Amino acid sequence: MAISRDSNAIVYLTFSNSGISVSGDGAKVSGTTVTIEKSGTYLAQGLSDEGNIVVGSSSVVLYLQHLVLSSKITAPIVVNSKLDDVKIINIQNTTLKDYEAETTTSGECAVIKVKKKSVVSFENQGLFTLYGECKNVIKGGAETSLIFANSNGEYKITAEKTGIASDGYLEFNLGKYTIISKNGDAIKSNPEDTDTASLGKILVNSGTFNIECLNDAFTAKTNLTVVKGTFDIKTENGYDSTTFDKDTSSAKGFKVKNNDTGCEMKLLDGEYNLNTADDAFHSNRDLTILKGKYIIYAGDDGVHASFNLVLGEKDAPNDELDLQVLSSYEGIEGMTITINSGRIVATAEDDGINAAGGDSGDQPGPGPRPGPWNKTRSNLRKGRLGEPGPGPSPGGRGNASYYISIYGGEVYVFCDGDGIDSNGNIFIHGGDIKVFSQGNRDNEPVDHDGNFTLFNGDLLGVGSRGMEQIHLGIKKGNEMYAYYSGAITKDKTLRIKNENGEVVKEGEITKDINYIFFSSLKLNNSYKFYVTDSTGTESELKFTFGQPESGDDDEDVHDNN
């Protein structure tokens, strides 16, 4: 898209190293600065090693066309405070650079600075390259709104600290965003605690985001919503970082900071490829993931909600949500966890799916969080063993505050700690659940401090004898169960075959185990269980079959799905 000089409605701002020329009324030049004083349409072009545009009026459209503009004393573009309906539109390749020193007292330390209470929308039809050598690239102050409208172009952002920030509100609609943040966050809306007027919200309607940053990729103080989009994110040195210190830094993929009522993260759809030194997804309040594809490698938790975590829509097809935590300390964690549907994979060095309380790193907590394991990678990460506890849990401290409810989905857990672990209760209403842990009695495939109730669904637990009493939670008349107690060494394949010899369940045993439990509506005493070693030799395991003895279905009084 190019704009012709024949348009009399456009005021042209032409930069060169010898000065700035203005083609009409509405803008005033003073030294290396041109100030837009009246509403209207303007086009900036040219090249200058020291220049600056100040938008001083509402209802301004500022086109950028083949503009190369740098400044060592202020931001190349400044939008003054309390302005509405300001549009900045890149229609041809534009490069903006800020070379200010961070110690400057008169500058803006940004490439584009939007001041308090202004509303600015951005459109990009070409390549928009922005370098922030001082601090930030695009920065909105208190109560600002920055809206990135539908665009076909690419934002190529390199920031010393933050790539895109607004204390008030950020919204993204289409476009490609390539962001490198050397010493800060990539995208954030995180006003100071003393600023109670700014919203601290981020909405992503769409877009393609390629992000590398030292700290968090997306941070919102109160609310972060993704409707859809494509995200390729790496924080710090990735999930296997040996330099990340969680006690002094935060390097999460997506984060909601506050834990006040109403604060939440919602991921409605999208494609995500996350490689984070810290948690991949972290909300200090609630977190909902409904649809999309998620590939997660996390140095700490894969998915964490300090309060309520919901995965999948109830009764939805499982292929609508594909959530794969392929490496983590704890796979999926929340005070309450509700799994409705989807394909859920949790791979963890500690617990796979864990209902526990409080925050895991952004706010202090009262209790110890044990660190008994000795993984080489994990020990190299600072602050893991004997670290401070997970923080305060809301409401009562009893078991009733914590629960896991599974209504459906295909759930796969591979872990060194407990597979499905609740500080309170576990309710299984449906789904196909496979848990592979290890033979250490302190780490069980299913562990709970409150009650365990299996109303419906298939459950396969492979690991230790600590879950020997799990059958007591199966509701009478619903399920049959079978178990095997005996040592089985690692590197074998477990297969369960029905009366017709068809394989109905299988999985890889990658750790030494001593107990297997299986329950299903379809199970009968004609089923057979086998393990196959690396040579292909198949051996039958002699399982014990049983019927549940518990009474009528109990009401799931703790489930608020």
Where are these regions (language model features)?
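A composition-driven surface/loop motif
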Residues: 1-561
